[in-house]
C-alpha cells in the first residue's frame, strides 16, 4: 500500500463514551475510515502510522440520519467505522504518535 493511501484510509478517531471504555478496558480503538477501505488496508494503515501490531479489525457502515431543515428533509452522509483491537502488550497513544 502506498504512503498516500495510508493517509486517506484513516479519517480520524471516533470519540464517544463507548469508544473510551473500549480503549481503557480492552485496548480497542475506534476510527472513522474511508467508505471504500478494506479491513486489510485499515490494519496496514494503523500499523504504519502508529507503529503497533493489530490483532483484529471489525468494520461497520453507519447510515446517515435524516434531518429536518427549514428547506425540507436532508440526509447526513453515510460513513464507515472500524474497531481496531491491538495485540497483547501493545498500546496506542494519540498524543505521542502525532509528533
From Swiss-Prot:
Q: Pfam family of this protein, just one?
A: Ribosomal_L23
Listed under GO biological process in this entry are:
translation
Q: Which residues form the signal peptide?
A: none
**Which Gene3D superfamilies does this one have?**
3.30.70.330
Which keywords belong to this entry?
A: Ribonucleoprotein, Ribosomal protein, RNA-binding, rRNA-binding
Is-annotated flag, keyword Ribosomal protein?
A: yes
Molecular-function GO terms, alphabetical: rRNA binding; structural constituent of ribosome
What InterPro entries does the database record attribute to this sequence?
A: Nucleotide-bd_a/b_plait_sf, Ribosomal_uL23-like, Ribosomal_uL23/eL15/eS24_sf
GO cellular component terms attached to this protein's record: ribonucleoprotein complex; ribosome
* Known role: One of the early assembly proteins it binds 23S rRNA. One of the proteins that surrounds the polypeptide exit tunnel on the outside of the ribosome. Forms the main docking site for trigger factor binding to the ribosome.
What HAMAP family does the record tag this protein with? Ribosomal_uL23_B (MF_01369_B)
Q: How does it assemble?
A: Part of the 50S ribosomal subunit. Contacts protein L29, and trigger factor when it is bound to the ribosome.
Tell me which family the UniProt entry assigns to this protein.
Belongs to the universal ribosomal protein uL23 family.
Identify this protein by name.
Large ribosomal subunit protein uL23
Organism from which the protein derives: Azotobacter vinelandii (strain DJ / ATCC BAA-1303)
